Amino acid sequence: MRILLINPNRYKFPPVPPIGIEYISCSMEHAGHEVEVLDLCFSDDIYKDIEESINIFKPEIVGLSVRNIDSVLYHNNEFFLEEMRDIVKFLKYNFNLCVIVGGTGLSTNPEGVVDYLGADVGIVGPAEETINILIEDIKNKSLRSSIYHGVLRKDVSCKRKIDAIDYKIYYENGGIAGFETHKGCSSSCPYCIEANKRVFLRDIDHVISEIKDFVSRGYNHFHLCDSEFNEDLDYSIEFCESLKRASLDIKWTAYMKPSEFSKRLLKLMRDTGVYLITLTVDSYRKCTMYWSDVERFVFTAKPLGIKVVIDFLTGFPYEKEEEICENINLLKRLLPDKISVNTYIRLYSSTQITKIIRGDPELKKYLIGNIEDDSLIRPVFYNHITSDDIKKIIGEDPLFIIEGIEKGVNYCRV
C-alpha cells in the first residue's frame, strides 16, 4: 500500500527531527509498502504542501506523528493538538483518507488523543512491528480496535531512513540529529508517561552504523533521544566502548539519572565526545542515598570536563517550602553548570501523581488549567510553590533558571 507519513511538529525551540518517522518508514518499506514522508516543520503553507503531496503520491493511508500534545511546561505553554486536529479534518474532508496516529504523545491518553484528533486508529508504544500488522488490518477492513499496542518481540534492530528528512535545514535552525540506544524505562517516576515501560535495548552495531551514516554526510553533533542513557549500566559501557573503537569525530549530549553510573562510564562518555549531561532530579519521596548519588554524579563528571545541568522537578503534593529550599541549597552547593527548576507538574490521565492528586479533594485548589476536563488532554498543572516563591529562594543567582520562562533546551543554552 502507499502510505504518507506526516510530521506536524512545528515547534522550533529547538526544531527536533522526527526520528520515529525514520524508523517507521524503513520498517514499512521492508514490508513491501511505498512510503513518502512530508515534514511540515518549516512549511510556509502546510495545507498547500499536504495537498500537493497527496496529489502527486496518491496515498491510501496517512500516518500522523504525535510527538507531544503540548510543550509540557507551564510558562509559555503551547498546545499542539488543535493544529493536528485541523490537519486530520483536512485529510478526511478533502481526500477521505484513513488516518493513523502514533508517537509518544499518545501515551498521555490513547483513546482521548485519538478521539480528540478525529483519527481512525492509533498506535501506542513502539510501532516498528505493529504498524505493518495495522496496515494489513486496514487493507482487509478488519480493524480490531481504535488503539493498537506496539510490541517489539525481538531485538530493537529496525533500520532508519535518514534520507527521509532534510537535516541541513534542522542544523541551520538550531536543531541537531538524534539517536536512541533503547526504548522504554524501568523507573517508576509518578509524573512521567514513560514510567515502568518494558525496556528494549537496541543492537549496538546498528546504532553505531546510524551515527557513522550521519558523520559521512557531514553531521557530527548529536543528542541522545533516550529518556535516560544509563538505563542499563553494562549496556551503556559496552555501547561507549564500541563508539570509542569507531574513532568518530563527534560531540553529543545525553540525559541521565543519578544512579546506575560509574566513573568508568563517564570517562568513556567523555572520550567518545560527550560534552554535556542533563541530570534529571526530582524531590518526590527521596531518601538520603538519592541525594548522595546526585552529589557523587556531579563530583565525578565535572572533574572529567563534562558539563552538568540539573533539571530539578519539585513542589510535589505535601512538600513544604522549607523542604524545597533545603533541597535547592543542597544542589547549589554542588556547583553544576546550571540548575533548571520546575514547580509546575503537568498532569496526565495515565500517571500516578494524577491519581494521588485526584484522591485528595484538598489538592484541587492547586490545579491550574482546564481542570473540568477529566481527559487532561488540554494542559492541567499542579502547583503550590509558585515561580515567585522560587525566585525568593534562588534570588539573583545566575546558576538557576526557572524552566519554561526561557524557551529552549540545555544543549542550546549552556
Task: State the predicted function of each range.
Residues 32-33, 91-96, 244-249, 303-306, ...:
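Short helix-capping segments at alpha-helix termini
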Residues 63-66, 127, 266-284, 337-346:
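Non-cysteine beta-strand/loop elements that form the S-adenosyl-L-methionine
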Residues 110-117, 265, 318-333:
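Catalytic cores of alpha/beta
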Residues 159-314, 329:
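Radical SAM [4Fe-4S] cluster-binding motif and immediate context
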